[in-house]
Amino acid sequence: IIIYADDLIKDIDEDFFEANKWLQNESADVTDLGRGETIFFEYQNLKFVLKHYYRGGMLGRYISDRYLWTGIDGSRSIREFRKLKELCLMGLPVPKPIGARVKKSGATYTADLITIEIEKSKTLSELIAEDHVNKNVWEAVGKCLHLFSNKEIYHPDLNTNNILID
């Protein structure tokens, strides 16, 4: 099952979500962020990010990337795609969603999400580790969080690894 925003890309298919396709390209890059690898690639002069969903916690040690199928509306990548689209329409600073894929197999599924890359961005965690966080950065983070809070948008897993600074 694939859903996508057809305003930028008209021809997304299964192959578009395959990491190996993009890794054959010299300009592709792999970053190990969070629970798994993230693929950065270029297509039609646009820069994208491909994220495959991996489980965390104790269960993730035994079942790396499979989730219980509860229907399309309950799938992680579809939910995130729809939420990002909604937040973009609200004018909030989030990555623009391009496509989401769910591969169902029996009672489980795997999931992938593609967004537009926020170029020249680093996670807040990376900036802290590099000792590049000053008063202006903290103020910008605070203003951004306040903006989300004012619109009653609350991230269920907000941490320094998923706050991007550009």
Which residues are covered by each model-predicted region?
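Hydrophobic residue at the +6 position relative to the catalytic HRD Asp in the kinase catalytic loop
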Residues: 158-165
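Conserved catalytic-core element of eukaryotic-like protein kinases
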Residues: 154
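Conserved alphaE helix
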Residues: 136-144
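AlphaC helix of the protein kinase catalytic domain
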Residues: 123-132
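N-terminal presequences and immediately downstream first alpha-helices
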Residues: 1-17, 41
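Conserved ATP-binding subdomain of kinase catalytic cores across diverse folds
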Residues: 15-122, 146, 150-151
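Alpha-helix N-cap and loop-to-helix initiation/capping positions
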Residues: 72, 132-136
